[in-house]
From Swiss-Prot:
Annotated motif AHA1, positions: 285-294
Subunit structure as annotated in this protein's UniProt entry: Homotrimer.
Listed name of the protein: Heat stress transcription factor A-8
GO molecular-function terms, A-Z: DNA-binding transcription factor activity; transcription cis-regulatory region binding
Biological classification of the source: Eukaryota, Viridiplantae, Streptophyta, Embryophyta, Tracheophyta
Comment block on domains: The hydrophobic-rich region (HR-A/B) corresponds to the oligomerization domain. AHA motifs are transcriptional activator elements.
Pfam families linked to this entry: HSF_DNA-bind
Keyword Methyltransferase (UniProt): no
Keywords recorded for this protein, A-Z: Activator, Cytoplasm, DNA-binding, Nucleus, Phosphoprotein, Repeat, Stress response, Transcription, Transcription regulation
Organism of origin: Arabidopsis thaliana
Primary site of residence: cytoplasm
Amino acid sequence: MVKSTDGGGGSSSSSSVAPFLRKCYDMVDDSTTDSIISWSPSADNSFVILDTTVFSVQLLPKYFKHSNFSSFIRQLNIYGFRKVDADRWEFANDGFVRGQKDLLKNVIRRKNVQSSEQSKHESTSTTYAQEKSGLWKEVDILKGDKQVLAQELIKVRQYQEVTDTKMLHLEDRVQGMEESQQEMLSFLVMVMKNPSLLVQLLQPKEKNTWRKAGEGAKIVEEVTDEGESNSYGLPLVTYQPPSDNNGTAKSNSNDVNDFLRNADMLKFCLDENHVPLIIPDLYDDGAWEKLLLLSPSRKKTKKQENIVKKGKDDLTLEEEEEDGTMELDKSYMLKLISEEMEKPDDFEFGQLTPERSRNLEILTEQMELLASNE
């Protein structure tokens, strides 16, 4: 009776033990496999795996029908086995004791392991989904920024095209201004070198004609628009500038004449409503020539180069003094001529008084004399 009771109790206790634990205990307790796996010599509640390769090839297929060593280790962790030594495959459990197989019923499988792994996996999936959603939002924001930048780039390109067009127009205007400045400087240099040229240009050509008064000068009658002839009894004097051998002054006079006619300068000089033309007393120190040479759009002519070269090489101290005196006379004569032209007589219609006619004749002869002395 007692024997049967013990047997029944043993069978009931063994039936409550998990198959993995029972097989693992038999494998460790087998003395024939002590070279592969055995009880730990330092403790009764632990065992050590000595040869993992042979253990995976021979013992695992024999007891568990697989040869996966990692799966065996994972099963040990599920049942609460812990690794004792980090350098060896030694595992211990308080219910896994040598010679006390009945204590295996105290070893309980941990159920929260699978749930924790599952929850960990779920949390990982949730985190990944959140990160993915955040990345997609950033992509959408970047797309919007790209569209805004594209529109701004189009506006900048349009503004650049408009600016380039304005710059081209501005360059054309600046070039025209430089050309006009160059023409004006050329004219001023020409007048400073030949003051008689200005007197010739200021004489009206259409209604009044001046000629040199000499012996036997004839009195010319001026015919008005109504066909009436007005005789003033005055000699008509025309000013003839001194002719150079090379004929340079004549060609320059024609060019300047055309320039002044195009610019309506003659009308401006003879109009009483405008400010009177005043020719200042200036010394010929070569400033106009220097300014002309420094002009950005300057086109040098042979005459200008010869003048500059002559002024640098051949001008002596005595010549400078003489030139200064002559230029003072020129400036003074130009001033007198301008004052005579500004007097409120009916100069435009040729009604000159004898006194003014004589003054102009004297001034003209003096200007001719100064021009011939050059």
